[in-house]
């Protein structure tokens, strides 16, 4: 099984962004694991959430490694994820026109600011509005904090009951998460 020690390195722009994808379903989940999956916003199969890596997130991901997979997200994959699967309230797609209302020129500009740490979170918490900093919103109101994905094209390469390092699909997979997400978009 691969160690999670490799995720300590700094990201391309200074922050390490991880994506978590729930692989297994809803049956036979212990209450503790189910609670952690809910906190990670992985409430159903093939949903994806994006986080800035911290010790608490790392511990939560470690506790759900039998139900989900995760790894470092690249800039290009995050852009594709927001463009093709990003949704706002009302299940409308996230567009550049919507971002322009909040001062952002494009998804690429928002992602670059997020990776550099200029934007703390991509979405606003419920009941919170964005703070305007230099004419740009600190978060995008109405953006859903999870992404609904398809099953991967071509299927899974391994068993969904084994860890990634043992020929399966679960647990930490490093940069290979980008390939999986692109197949699921």
Swiss-Prot record:
Cross-referenced SUPFAM superfamilies: Ribosomal protein L30p/L7e
GO CC, alphabetical: cytosolic large ribosomal subunit
Pfam families listed in its UniProt record: Ribosomal_L30
Superkingdom of this protein's organism: Archaea
Protein name (database record): Large ribosomal subunit protein uL30
Oligomer and partners: Part of the 50S ribosomal subunit.
BP term (GO), one: maturation of LSU-rRNA from tricistronic rRNA transcript (SSU-rRNA, 5.8S rRNA, LSU-rRNA)
Family: Belongs to the universal ribosomal protein uL30 family.
Keywords: Ribonucleoprotein, Ribosomal protein
A GO term, aspect molecular function: RNA binding
Keyword Cell division: no
């Amino acid at each position: 099984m691969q160690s999670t020690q490799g995720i300590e390195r700094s990201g391309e722009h200074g922050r390490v962004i991880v994506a978590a994808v729930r692989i297994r379903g809803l049956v036979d989940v212990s209450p503790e694991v189910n609670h952690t999956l809910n906190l990670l916003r992985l409430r159903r199969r093939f949903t994806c959430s994006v986080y800035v890596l911290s010790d608490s997130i790392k511990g939560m991901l470690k506790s759900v490694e039998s139900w989900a997979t995760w790894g470092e997200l690249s800039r290009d994959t995050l852009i594709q994820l927001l463009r093709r699967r990003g949704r706002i309230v009302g299940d409308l797609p996230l567009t550049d026109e919507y971002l322009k209302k909040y001062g952002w020129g494009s998804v690429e500009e928002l992602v670059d600011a997020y990776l550099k740490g200029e934007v703390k979170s991509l979405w606003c918490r419920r009941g919170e509005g964005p703070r305007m900093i230099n004419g740009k919103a600190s978060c995008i109101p109405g953006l859903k904090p999870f992404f609904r994905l398809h099953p991967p094209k071509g299927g899974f390469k391994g068993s969904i009951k084994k860890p990634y390092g043992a020929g399966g699909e679960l647990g930490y997979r490093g940069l290979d998460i980008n390939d999986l997400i692109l197949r699921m978009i």
